[in-house]
Amino acid sequence: DEIFNLAELPHSMVVIGAGVVGIEYASMFALMGVEVTMVDTRERPLEFLDREIIDELVHQMRDIKVVFRLGETVAKVETRENARRRVVVSLESGKRLIADVALVCAGRAGNTHSLNLGAAGLEADERGRLTVNDKFRTQQSHIYAGGDVIGFPALAATSSEQGRLAACNAFGVEVGPMPTNFPVGIYSIPEISMVGEAEHELTARKIPYEVGIARF
């Protein structure tokens, strides 16, 4: 979130992490003329999406000059004083990426470190996340949680629904469980949305399906 504090648009940027947030920011900054390089340990970004959609997204991002360094691990990040390009990102493969800024998109962490959870009988994991049951109740029967603080998928649409269900359960309002198939919205350019399982997941589970394609 510190990216919003930039005083001016950088000339170049290294984005570490090709997840949802990384892809969103990379495409936005690239369209504003920033030289963007993405680094991720995985061979394919956004692996939970249909591969055909991912391939098309990567193709379009390359068209706006985004460079992908996939299957690469960051060894260290250093800053240089009084240099025009102030950040050096060294990869374990020996490559060095030099840019004005580096944006680390390593997933959302729960903002719970200052809440003194122990006083309420709660304990967060190393990323500040709480454990809840299917009704979003924590270890304490009178405390409920939803959204980024309980982990995956940590998206706006799902967090809103989790919050609604948690509030209903807390006040004894009868509601059903969280839907198994929830909508996913990714605000990249172009935008991506999906609901349900991806094609490769259905194939792995030997579930018959049909494919329809509409281009627009």
Regions found by a protein language model. Give the residues of each.
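Proline- and acidic/polar-enriched loop/turn elements at helix boundaries
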Residues: 41, 73-74, 115, 129, ...
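General small-molecule cofactor/ligand-binding pocket signal
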Residues: 67-69, 144, 210-212
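Structured beta-strand/loop patches that form or line metal/cofactor-binding pockets in enzymes
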Residues: 193-216
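Short loop/edge segments at beta-strand edges and connector loops
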Residues: 1, 70-72, 78, 126, ...
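Rossmann-like dinucleotide-binding cores of NAD(P)H-dependent redox enzymes
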Residues: 4-5, 10-14, 20-88, 93, ...
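Glycine-rich beta-alpha junction loops
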Residues: 43, 103-108, 148, 183-190, ...
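FAD-site-proximal beta/loop scaffold in flavoenzymes
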Residues: 1-10, 96-171
